[in-house]
Amino acid sequence: MGSHRRYLYYSILSFLLLSCSVVLAKQDKTPFFEGTSSKNSRLTAQDKGNDTCPPCFNCMLPIFECKQFSECNSYTGRCECIEGFAGDDCSLPLCGGLSPDESGNKDRPIRAQNDTCHCDNGWGGINCDVCQEDFVCDAFMPDPSIKGTCYKNGMIVDKVFSGCNVTNEKILQILNGKIPQITFACDKPNQECNFQFWIDQLESFYCGLSDCAFEYDLEQNTSHYKCNDVQCKCVPDTVLCGAKGSIDISDFLTETIKGPGDFSCDLETRQCKFSEPSMNDLILTVFGDPYITLKCESGECVHYSEIPGYKSPSKDPTVSWQGKLVLALTAVMVLALFTFATFYISKSPLFRNGLGSSKSPIRLPDEDAVNNFLQNEDDTLATLSFENITYSVPSINSDGVEETVLNEISGIVKPGQILAIMGGSGAGKTTLLDILAMKRKTGHVSGSIKVNGISMDRKSFSKIIGFVDQDDFLLPTLTVFETVLNSALLRLPKALSFEAKKARVYKVLEELRIIDIKDRIIGNEFDRGISGGEKRRVSIACELVTSPLVLFLDEPTSGLDASNANNVIECLVRLSSDYNRTLVLSIHQPRSNIFYLFDKLVLLSKGEMVYSGNAKKVSEFLRNEGYICPDNYNIADYLIDITFEAGPQGKRRRIRNISDLEAGTDTNDIDNTIHQTTFTSSDGTTQREWAHLAAHRDEIRSLLRDEEDVEGTDGRRGATEIDLNTKLLHDKYKDSVYYAELSQEIEEVLSEGDEESNVLNGDLPTGQQSAGFLQQLSILNSRSFKNMYRNPKLLLGNYLLTILLSLFLGTLYYNVSNDISGFQNRMGLFFFILTYFGFVTFTGLSSFALERIIFIKERSNNYYSPLAYYISKIMSEVVPLRVVPPILLSLIVYPMTGLNMKDNAFFKCIGILILFNLGISLEILTIGIIFEDLNNSIILSVLVLLGSLLFSGLFINTKNITNVAFKYLKNFSVFYYAYESLLINEVKTLMLKERKYGLNIEVPGATILSTFGFVVQNLVFDIKILALFNVVFLIMGYLALKWIVVEQK
């Protein structure tokens, strides 16, 4: 064995001496990364006499092998080369760099023969696999937003590449200028390394090291890579391995080098050594050195958190003084804004001291001032005439067939007169009143409506009229005085002073005898307020306060007792007669004394005009046609009775007398009628019978509707017949002189030459300016805020719930950690917050449902523009309920949970929550505006929110959705953009650590976000999209309010 070693030593020594004799250059120390201009060529032995085509490369064949100890793929017969080499047998060095180029191409160029590598910017080494700059490592990071680090300290993290210059002086002297170098790469997870020995950048031999352990001596600042198994091979026909004029150590490398191998470095000086027992013996014998000494440079692309010795900053369990200052300033700012808003609102007319206060004296206006106000300066009056008003609607049972509701109704009413529209239930009174007031109708309207003989458009007509609905739609939290004042401030000319408007309010309240309840709230079914009759008078007061030229009232006495009904009608009569106003009202069953206060009458039955003209002449007309109202019988009741129709067949029945019904007599055997010209009984009996008839009218009608027409058995001639044929009465009126008088009166009004009609004394005041837009907005805001603080349940409940929920969440997620479980907690926290704010917005549906009918009524009566109401609702309801809660929640949750306070993350979080809360509330409000039914709007809102939640990014990774039908649905989810932006704002800059398998694994928060399908760079983009959602739904809500929420009867 000793002789064998001596032989090897002598052989190597002879080779080194021979090499020294042919070297022309002198020894020179060359840095490892310095380029060389050597043009040495590899010597290749070719058998020129062999003309046979060589077999294709197949590493499975014994004549071929994979260099660098690369693995052979048994399926393809190709070598799977280690990093830095290519070619069929992995013998060709690669250049360029480890990272892909700008186009993403990872194919590295092969080094040209007899040339050196030209490395890409940021890479170095013989094979261009040692990083030099940090930026080249960005390509190896899991997300483009994460920056990589070129770690050059030499301690392996995952896979390190090193390049070394041999520094043994005797070896350098013997090579006489040729540069010996080593490339060394280790793979820590696989516990293996590879080693290449180069002379003038031409590979001579290589080694593979396995079963490696990687140790560090932190005290000495050294690293030790120990590999138990080492195997080496020569590259044929190279220096030291059979090149011409050189010795061949192939057998020595293959048979003698077995390991263990040790690669140790001083990490401060970068001085390294490579030792292996057999190789050490050779070096010691020949050169006198115990091992190969090296000067190395290494590089490994890692994330900064993976650098050995790196310690992630510990999470401060308490809020810093800067954070406390931010929280305090934010709280002060919110309080200041609230104070300013309160002060601004208190300056509104509805909030002035003394208005409507029970302690303030009531100063009624002077009579002259009121008269001057009620009477127009130009003495403009309005005569309303209408001809052949016909209204039809599509029939439910017949396709394409229209059902006539009103048929050719005509009439006229002049200033100072009251026109009453009467008839039984279903006669068409309210329909005719709506048409005369030019309300929007769903059916087809024909005929003409003129004021002073001139046709007017709906917009101009609405400015000179007032309309009192049959039902009372009033804000329940306002007082009587505030309700009427609200109408006055919004609708009276803005040129009038506030004192003049207030004086008019007091006067109207006095006229309607509700001045004593002026400080009582309206109330509703939950909060007791004024009575139903008082509400009716308040509704009338809201219209009377504007002193319209034409006032329409639908059942003004409905719900009032006899005394109050008489007071209301007398007030209307005074308004009509004293101030020459034109009044049109529908009324069902007035008292007789009220009936005789009417100037004009339109009597309807089943949509047909039975009479139209002077109210006092209706008895004369009926008497002429054989219908005589009994003495002491209410003429209004009598008119309803005679227009009552028995049924679709026009059936009639006969009644002998009222006492028969009272006594229970079988009316099928009686022949009598209500209307008779002579009476067989005494006057007292007759009076009692008619009194009984008035009290039991509905019972008699029921009998008339259900019984068959039966002829009496006694055949007495004293009884007369109840003629219920509406068509007959209609035809009789059309043929009467009264209809002719009506037609002539209408013609006179239409005639421009009629100077005595006194109805064309001035132009109609359609251009009168009421409150401007800003005035409307101020009044509506003050009204809404007053409504809010008098009924603070919704506002305070929202705030209280938000505070309690914030405390609960702060306690549950207290001091959330910076690890994977902390990331999960953050996801759950933000998702729950968004879900809470999302479903709380449902309160907007119920609040608008209560206001919808009030808005429709006030809009149709020209209180304000839809835009003023919409902006007022946003300012007075959406802002307090959707802006303040996110701020309160953030002020509590942020310090308790210890969320990220860096880079203004706190303010960004507040902004994101506010934008989301506003956006989702506007979306829900838009749905509530579009759908009139509250149940339908709630169902659709739930579906919208659930769909938005599904695509928020928590329940499904939106990047992995391949179905085209669902792939882009996240783009319509407000939750997705809010959720993504909140997570990015919180986690992007955090380093999350986790203890797994005994290792402290650190993962950038941005990496986890990318895993969940979120795009880390989208923070600003998401915020812009949230703002866009707000703008879109804000516009959609207004357009829906303007075009959908309109009065249509």
UniProtKB/Swiss-Prot annotation:
Which GO terms fall under biological process for this protein? transmembrane transport
Q: Name one GO cellular component term.
A: fungal-type vacuole
Membrane topology term: Multi-pass membrane protein
Lumenal side of membrane: 26-324, 482-793, 850-877, 931-937, 1022-1024
Q: Which domain of life is it from?
A: Eukaryota
Localization recorded for this chain is: Endoplasmic reticulum membrane
What is the first-listed, main subcellular location in coarse terms? endoplasmic reticulum
What family name appears in the similarity comment? Belongs to the ABC transporter superfamily. ABCG family. Eye pigment precursor importer (TC 3.A.1.204) subfamily.
Q: What is this protein called?
A: Probable ATP-dependent permease
Gene encoding the protein: ADP1
